[in-house]
Amino acid sequence: MSAPDDLLRVSAERLLVAIRDILAEKSIVSPAEIADRIAITEAASPAQGGGIVARAWVDPLFRQRLLGDGTRAVEELGVVMRGAPPLGVVENDGSVHHLVVCTLCSCYPRAVLGYPPFWFKSASYRARAVRDPRGLLAEWGTIVPAGVKLRIVDSTADYRWMVLPRRPEGTDGWDEERLASIVTAGDMIGVTIPKIA
């Protein structure tokens, strides 16, 4: 890192500490609440989302609850949703394939998937997901057959979306851990589908 980069990093850290101190001083939020929120955010990851998908694949009752009220269902698995927008879950099947996009910015289900991939926030992805979704998916190697409806789901500041992908053929008898290992962030956004290695 260069000296200007170091200076910028130090300045940003000082600003962050100052904001945190002001929020605590005004009793808006305590340092413990800030630390708690940071821990929750850092615990979220695509692996956590993969575990949610795997549970839905092996437990039909959980799958029903997940599709009915995603927020409540993921909380059953220990995912902390406090302070996060509600979570909706849509299911890919033989007749419909869902693709999640935030057309305005980068609203992403961070509570279950962690930080968004860089491309999810890009203007190119956001525009093409709406204008040319089949072309966009083809670039990811995901071909949605002509007979399958492609539904674009707009994730917003008020409501976040996640895709429950189709379980791949040939995974009968797999346990949850093995199933979770094949699920990627792209699968839960709808740009890719789970593949058996």
Positions of predicted regions on the chain:
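Terminal, compositionally biased segments used for targeting/anchoring and flexible tails
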Residues: M1-A197
